[in-house]
Amino acid sequence: MACSAMTKLALVVALCMVVSVPIAQALTCGQVSSNLAPCIAYVRGGGAVPPACCNGIRNINNLAKTTADRQTACNCLKQLSASVPGVNANNAAALPGKCGVNVPYKISPSTNCATVK
């Protein structure tokens, strides 16, 4: 009887541990676009990069924890650059460096996001 009670207790403890583990949320294009909205003026016209833009790039980079997240971010950036009129590809590609953020892919319409690790 004592063995059965200990087994049940162990199962309850294990179940609580599994249930309490936070589930990672996947990065979305909505998060990418809202974080990078302050960058639109810069990628269109150059000049000084707004601090809010750099904060957005840092935030996206920090949110992209997995390969799937980084590939999602890459694809979202490609979609955004195609949908926002007047984007200067050189300005977009220069953003991470100007903000001191190491992004593991080039921000470019020609980037193959499937190869992003």
From Swiss-Prot:
Pfam families: Tryp_alpha_amyl. Keywords: Allergen, Disulfide bond, Lipid-binding, Signal, Transport. One of its GO terms (molecular function) is lipid binding. Belongs to the plant LTP family. CDD domains: nsLTP1. This is Non-specific lipid-transfer protein. Residues 1-26 form the signal peptide. It comes from the Eukaryota. It comes from Prunus avium (Cherry).
